UniProtKB/Swiss-Prot annotation:
Keyword DNA-binding on entry: no
Amino-acid positions noted as binding Ca(2+) in the UniProt annotation, renumbered to this chain: Y25, G27, G29, D46
Cofactor comment text: Binds 1 Ca(2+) ion.
Cofactor(s) recorded in Swiss-Prot or TrEMBL: Ca(2+)
Annotated function: PLA2 catalyzes the calcium-dependent hydrolysis of the 2-acyl groups in 3-sn-phosphoglycerides.
GO terms, molecular function: calcium ion binding; calcium-dependent phospholipase A2 activity; phospholipid binding
PROSITE patterns cross-referenced by the UniProt entry: PA2_ASP, PA2_HIS
Active site location: H45, D86
EC number: 3.1.1.4
Reaction(s) catalysed (UniProt annotation): a 1,2-diacyl-sn-glycero-3-phosphocholine + H2O = a 1-acyl-sn-glycero-3-phosphocholine + a fatty acid + H(+)
Record key words, sorted: Calcium, Disulfide bond, Hydrolase, Lipid degradation, Lipid metabolism, Metal-binding, Secreted
InterPro entries the record matches: PLipase_A2, PLipase_A2_Asp_AS, PLipase_A2_dom, PLipase_A2_dom_sf, PLipase_A2_His_AS
Organism: Bitis gabonica (Gaboon adder)
Name of the protein in question: Acidic phospholipase A2
Length: 118
């Protein structure tokens, strides 16, 4: 669920609050082309959730563990898929922290142009 995703981000050394309104894809919804590697993490995360169809991605909880700086997801197949979407995004944020640009926090969606396919 979203709380667990936020906790994953925090445990990987980032603040979840940095990503709530960042770029064109971090936060609710998204449009246009991702503006940098950090925003692309959110784009890929949105695409991953989108592939799950009608599954309740935002409120379904799952089990995971942080071990040796990595994230291990639950074995339940559908919950594991959801956890993997969140795991990949949390690691992506950590790996791309150097691309984070505070000018893109609160970025207006009207500036998000073009198209990008999942």
């Amino acid at each position: 669920d979203l709380t667990q995703f936020g906790n994953m981000i925090n445990k990987m050394g980032q603040s979840v609050f940095d990503y709530i309104y960042y770029g064109c894809y971090c936060g609710w919804g998204g449009k246009g082309k991702p503006i940098d590697a950090t925003d692309r993490c959110c784009f890929v995360h949105d695409c991953c959730y989108g592939k799950m169809g009608t599954y309740d991605t935002k409120w379904t909880s799952y089990n995971y563990e942080i071990q040796n700086g990595g994230i291990d997801c639950d074995e339940d197949p559908q919950k594991k898929e959801l956890c993997e979407c969140d795991r990949v995004a949390a690691i992506c944020f950590a790996n791309n922290r150097n691309t984070y640009n505070s000018n893109y926090f609160g970025h207006s969606s009207s500036k998000c142009t073009g198209t990008e396919q999942c």
